[in-house]
């Protein structure tokens, strides 16, 4: 995020945004932050929403105040907001397609998920499970939540790995899984 926005500001594609907040995936805190940004008079708010519906009231208030709201990854369902989303389920499924090409005999798979309860985590995991259903030579032997953080993922994997049968592959939701197994 920092690299891309920094380059975009230097090229004049976007103006510099002096405010950056994090709510640690807490809906009430995120809603309060949106309301503070409204009061501060920002022209736009870009948000990775902690909940698809839980922020709609605050987002609607921002839109009503003439603020452009853009949600990405964790998107909001409020119609006034712009939504930038990818096919997260497809992202999960394509991992298993790749494994099927690389490991045609299949085997046990360890799934390292993201942050529990977040739409993106659920969608990617759903895609992984759909991929395993399509490629029946694979079986998910275990699943842990790595919270999209390498240290958390490594600790979670260390806790479950000794109890699993031989694992042939690891599927993840991002770089958090590197070096985890």
Please identify what each model-predicted range represents:
Residues 1-181:
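A residue-level marker of the well-folded mature domains of exported/periplasmic proteins
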């Amino acid at each position: 995020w920092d690299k891309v926005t920094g380059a975009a500001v230097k090229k004049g594609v976007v103006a510099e945004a002096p405010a950056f907040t994090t709510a640690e995936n807490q809906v009430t805190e995120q809603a309060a932050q949106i309301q503070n940004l409204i009061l501060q008079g920002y022209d736009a708010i870009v948000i990775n929403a902690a909940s698809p519906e839980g922020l709609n009231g605050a987002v609607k208030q921002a839109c009503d105040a003439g603020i452009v709201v853009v949600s990405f990854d964790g998107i909001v369902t409020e119609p006034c907001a712009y939504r930038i989303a990818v096919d997260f389920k497809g992202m999960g499924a394509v991992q298993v397609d790749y494994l099927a090409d690389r490991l045609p005999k299949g085997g046990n798979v360890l799934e390292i998920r993201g942050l529990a309860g977040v739409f993106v985590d659920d969608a990617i995991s759903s895609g992984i499970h759909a991929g395993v259903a399509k490629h029946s030579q694979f079986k998910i032997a275990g699943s842990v939540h790595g919270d999209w953080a390498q240290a958390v993922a490594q600790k979670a994997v260390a806790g479950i790995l000794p109890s699993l049968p031989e694992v042939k592959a690891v599927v993840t939701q991002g770089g958090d899984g590197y070096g985890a197994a």
